[in-house]
UniProtKB/Swiss-Prot annotation:
The lineage of its organism: Bacteria, Pseudomonadati, Pseudomonadota, Gammaproteobacteria, Alteromonadales. Belongs to the TPP enzyme family. MenD subfamily. It holds the Pfam family TPP_enzyme_M_2. Pathway: Quinol/quinone metabolism; 1,4-dihydroxy-2-naphthoate biosynthesis; 1,4-dihydroxy-2-naphthoate from chorismate: step 2/7; Quinol/quinone metabolism; menaquinone biosynthesis. It catalyses: isochorismate + 2-oxoglutarate + H(+) = 5-enolpyruvoyl-6-hydroxy-2-succinyl-cyclohex-3-ene-1-carboxylate + CO2. Binds 1 thiamine pyrophosphate per subunit. This is 2-succinyl-5-enolpyruvyl-6-hydroxy-3-cyclohexene-1-carboxylate synthase.
Length: 573
């Protein structure tokens, strides 16, 4: 391929970047239309190693990429044009950075001479994501810059990266080649002559090795640590960390396993899942206050009561295990932080505690709460908690569950039922925003091809209405369960000093339903007001090969009134 003209060299650079990313483990590329990113777009269109996903809204596109990366546990590339298109990725990049999800942004940009002079669609893109991405600024393609310099730059930026990378790609016009035929990375090209060996192989140009040594305590340290009354608290764990190993660890030491909604163990029968509620139970709380040792796996705990318990307790020893170099200790109590995966740490040489089974009575208290929830939620008034418990009990091994922020994830954390197994569970709890939740769930569903359920509030769904266009293109089941309580009713749980202020400035009632939105995107839709109809609609949707919507309409105060009543019963237990 001849390389004299700018459009051709632009295209070659785009193809080199995409080819190297594929060799570095990228499986998916998410693309939004735009002119300045044309060299990347045309290269991606011919790249057979990547699955392409297209969407017109960059904010939703970024969250879809986040979901794909969460599900695949591999980096995902995103291609956007210049200007505010890049800025629209910011919320997804923030979430990805905080939760160690590798996204690679490839942003088309104007050349240097068109920046800061009033040229159209030109903003300062380098550093646009501030502290939330590793930044790489590529020059405009130049035949005097060796192609291997481009490859080594990409390799250094992406290799072993567990967080977002922003590669800003400047291109001069013309952007469109006169024709698009043949192989872009032509072995006969004089410009590519230094890459002849690389072109014939399938590995990255530069391979970075990483000798990761497990950060682990000594046998003596373990023996001293378990010599007392302790608890194991499990926060956010990704599915591949094999949290089942923590069940065995709990049983070996003889300490109770207290599990968060994001632990992949919230519903496990061997875990104490109702910890948020047990901390309101007088006898259970008194018992838990006897603990003087704690082993915390993961971070970003959901329950304020659990966070408060960890902060207020006078711990003799506080160990935390994190898979990455992170600071996830808002109570500032952790005395030892070990960097290891949960299953690696659980496989160490642990000893039976001298106070094994000291808190076995928690099982009885946990069972009391289970019976209370069956009577007052499952057999009570139709509402949000009842729907969430029904979803959590339905075919968990066959599906994966994405739980939306605000009220849904808290209801799941407080009231999820004990089950023989738990669906693989996902959340966006890095920055805990209510934007992009549907798009993230679409990305998860698109990668796995497995039935996926999304539990989402009405305001969250309104935030991400555009992403119904992504959902429309899915070929695997995605059940979008919208809990419509007409506004931000999590604020019913917060001490807003005046009911009128709560209504006018926090709850923001809208009076909207989602039937017309479903019709606009040609998605199956059901509206239900009782458990039997919900269960029928839900089972039907799990078997539908595509996305569908179930809208659950409840009164504004239903969930908050039920929570208040249940809290009162628990406190009087």
């Amino acid at each position: 391929m001849r390389t004299e003209n700018t459009a051709t060299l632009n295209l070659i650079w785009g193809a080199l970047i995409l080819e190297e990313l594929a060799r570095l483990g990228v499986q998916h590329v998410c693309m939004a239309p735009g002119s300045r990113s044309t060299p990347l777009t045309l290269a991606a269109a011919q790249q057979t190693k990547l699955q392409r996903h297209l969407h017109f809204d960059e904010r939703g596109l970024g969250f879809m990429a986040l979901g794909l990366a969460k599900a695949s546990r591999a980096p995902v590339a995103i291609i956007t044009t210049s200007g505010t298109a890049v800025a629209n990725l910011y919320p997804a990049i923030v979430e990805a950075w905080l939760t160690h999800v590798p996204l690679i942004v490839l942003s088309g940009d104007r050349p240097p001479e068109l920046l800061g002079c009033g040229a159209n669609q030109a903003i300062v893109q380098p550093g646009i994501f501030a502290n939330y991405a590793t930044q790489v600024n590529l020059p405009t393609p130049d035949a005097h810059i060796a192609p291997q310099a481009l490859l080594t730059t990409v390799d250094e930026a992406v290799a072993n990266q567990t967080r977002p990378v922003h590669i800003n790609c400047m291109y001069r016009e013309p952007l469109y080649p006169s024709e698009l035929s043949g192989v872009i990375l032509d072995t006969e090209s004089p410009y590519l002559k230094p890459l002849q060996t690389w072109l014939q192989l399938a590995r990255p140009y530069t391979q970075y090795g990483k000798c990761k040594q497990l950060s682990s305590p000594s046998d003596d340290a373990i023996m001293r640590f378990v010599h007392g009354k302790g608890v194991i608290v499990v926060g956010t764990l990704t599915p591949e960390q094999d949290p089942q190993q923590l069940i065995a660890l709990s049983q070996k030491i003889g300490w109770p396993l207290l599990t968060d909604a994001q632990s992949q163990l919230r519903q496990h029968p061997a875990a104490i899942g109702n910890i948020d509620q047990l901390l309101q139970h007088p006898r259970a709380r008194n018992l838990l206050q006897e603990a003087d040792r704690v082993l915390v796996f993961g971070g970003r705990l959901l329950s304020k009561r659990v966070i408060g318990y960890l902060a207020e307790q006078n711990w003799h020893s506080y160990w935390q295990v994190l898979p990455e170099q992170d600071r996830l200790d808002p109570s500032h109590n952790a005395k030892h932080i070990w960097h290891a995966n949960a299953e690696q740490f659980a496989a160490l040489n642990w000893y039976r505690s001298s106070s094994a089974n000291w808190a076995n009575t928690l099982i009885t208290y946990n069972d009391e709460l289970h019976n209370l929830f069956v009577r007052n939620i499952d057999q009570g008034e139709f509402g949000e908690a009842q729907v969430i418990r029904a979803i959590a009990n339905t075919r968990p091994l066959e599906q994966q569950l994405f739980i939306g922020n605000s009220l849904p994830v808290r209801l799941y954390d407080m009231y999820a039922p004990v089950s023989c197994c738990t669906a693989t569970t996902y959340t966006n709890r890095g920055a805990s925003g209510i934007d992009g939740l549907l798009a993230t769930a679409c990305g998860i569903a698109a990668h796995k091809g497995k039935a996926t359920s999304l539990i989402i509030g009405d305001l969250s769904q309104l935030h991400d209405l555009n992403s119904l266009a992504i959902a429309k293109g899915l070929t695997s089941p995605l059940v979008i369960v919208i809990l419509n309580n007409d506004g931000g009713n999590i604020f019913n749980l917060l001490p807003v000093p005046n009911e009128q202020v709560r209504s006018d400035y926090y709850r923001l009632s809208h009076g909207l339903e989602f039937g017309y939105a479903a019709a606009m995107f040609n998605l199956p839709y059901n509206q239900v007001d009782n458990l039997a109809d919900f269960q029928d609609s839900y089972n039907e949707a799990l078997d539908f090969q595509g996305a569908s919507i179930i809208e659950v309409n409840v009164s504004q105060n239903q969930a908050s009134d039920q929570i208040a009543a249940l809290n009162l019963w628990v406190k009087q237990s």
